[in-house]
């Protein structure tokens, strides 16, 4: 519901501790409501025991940022082990795990489940619930910023000024609204679907030519 007022911020390999300094000062901006380090808009894939799930990263601010509730266990913290992960209810059900907290997943290394999150819709357009695994990642250069209602243009200007003050390079900061990125993703999905349908018809046509040729 907040995707139209959530900005995704990204910079290509900022120098030294510039990004950490930048994100640490975001809440000084009055128009900024909250922020979190997350790559929720560029999800990967996780596979174990022949079962696939979406994979993303998040930090200790991830759950409160999206207003998510823990069903079991605990959320991330700065003292969380490097292999700590959160999973959603759909993941637990799909994997048929009886006691998910402190359960160890083995796939490209080990992952320790520290908590279970309620199912939530990642993509507001498709509204689909999928098995999800969230890795602890507090150092991502992808940051989501929630802007107060009616303050988007002012907030963007102040964010750009803050980045320029810290890095000296205003152009190096990239940002999109979460809603806009969802729309781009779905347009790409529609293009792929149209191509699949087109090639299916071509295949049927060529098959028919072979039968009657």
Report each predicted region and the residues it spans.
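Membrane-proximal extracellular/periplasmic loop immediately following the first transmembrane helix
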Residues: 1-57
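Membrane-proximal juxtamembrane linkers immediately C-terminal to transmembrane helices
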Residues: 1-9, 69, 127-128, 138
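Short, contiguous acidic/charged loop-to-helix segments that flank catalytic cores in large enzymes
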Residues: 9-14, 50-51, 75-82, 131-137, ...
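"Rare, low-scoring activations can occur
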Residues: 17-34, 89-93, 108-193
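Conserved beta-strand termini and adjacent loop/short-helix elements that scaffold enzyme active sites
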Residues: 37-40, 73, 175-178
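Hydrophobic secondary-structure segments that place a key small or acidic residue at a functional site
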Residues: 52-130
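Hydrophobic alpha-helical transmembrane segments of multi-pass inner-membrane transport and secretion
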Residues: 190-213
